[in-house]
């Protein structure tokens, strides 16, 4: 299984089925690819309704006849745009043809900006994805929460955690999150896209590895194999 970081919080998972999480491609200053560069996508996972996460979900879904997995409200919004969806909510899990997805809590917002209006986008979340014998945790946008302690029991293989501060956890809180989750690997995300979310990623790596957890800093476009 190949996992590619596409910048900000966008992650491409290529295996027996191809998944993309938070597909912010167009307009993402950190993303090294264009929509036409993506492989065929089978499923799109959207953690919440903000534009830098909902991103190109509609265009990718229609081009690939892909299914969007998100919360109920976002799925209702996308369904009206002709997109195939599978609605979930926090704490719910479902076995798909590629593996199991569980929606986890996140502390953030989820409003969808539509012209001059903000549409209610339900509750933000993260995803615990079990596929091909591995577990991937994508936290979405979130502050530090004690709920993360429950993930320690899941034996997460790789955790994608936001570290950029201001809107999400900063480096210090993300380090605390790692101690709660105890993943085998952690990949920092949601930092450096814009100046307001600058983070000292090398400090994060140093502190995480002092805890005995491997920290993999992926530049946009780089991949790891699971």
Swiss-Prot record:
Gene3D superfamilies: Ribonuclease Z/Hydroxyacylglutathione hydrolase-like. Coiled coil: none annotated. This is UPF0173 metal-dependent hydrolase CTN_1413. Keywords: Hydrolase. The keyword Kinase does not apply. InterPro entries: Metallo-B-lactamas, RibonucZ/Hydroxyglut_hydro, UPF0173, UPF0173_UPF0282_UlaG_hydrolase. The keyword Hydrolase applies. Signal peptide: none annotated. Belongs to the UPF0173 family. It comes from the Bacteria. GO terms for molecular function: hydrolase activity.
């Amino acid at each position: 299984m190949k996992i590619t970081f596409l910048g900000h919080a966008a992650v491409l998972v290529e295996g027996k089925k191809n998944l993309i999480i938070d597909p912010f491609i167009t307009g993402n200053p950190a993303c090294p690819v264009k929509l036409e560069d993506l492989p065929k996508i089978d499923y799109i996972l959207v953690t919440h309704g903000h534009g830098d996460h909902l991103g190109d979900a509609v265009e990718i879904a229609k081009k690939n006849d892909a299914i969007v997995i998100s919360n109920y409200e976002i799925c209702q919004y996308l369904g009206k745009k002709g997109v195939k969806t599978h609605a979930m909510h926090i704490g719910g899990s479902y076995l798909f043809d590629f593996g199991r997805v569980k929606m986890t809590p996140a502390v953030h917002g989820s409003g969808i900006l539509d012209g001059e209006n903000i549409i209610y986008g339900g509750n933000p979340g993260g995803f615990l994805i079990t596929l091909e014998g591995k577990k991937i945790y994508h936290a979405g946008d979130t502050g530090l929460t004690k709920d993360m302690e429950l993930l320690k029991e899941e034996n997460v293989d790789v955790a994608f955690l936001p570290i950029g501060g201001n809107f999400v956890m900063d480096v210090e809180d993300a380090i605390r999150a790692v101690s709660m989750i105890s993943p085998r690997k952690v990949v920092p995300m949601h930092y450096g896209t814009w100046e307001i979310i600058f983070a000292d990623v090398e400090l994060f790596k140093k502190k995480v590895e002092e805890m005995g957890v491997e920290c993999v800093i992926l530049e946009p476009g780089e991949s790891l194999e699971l």
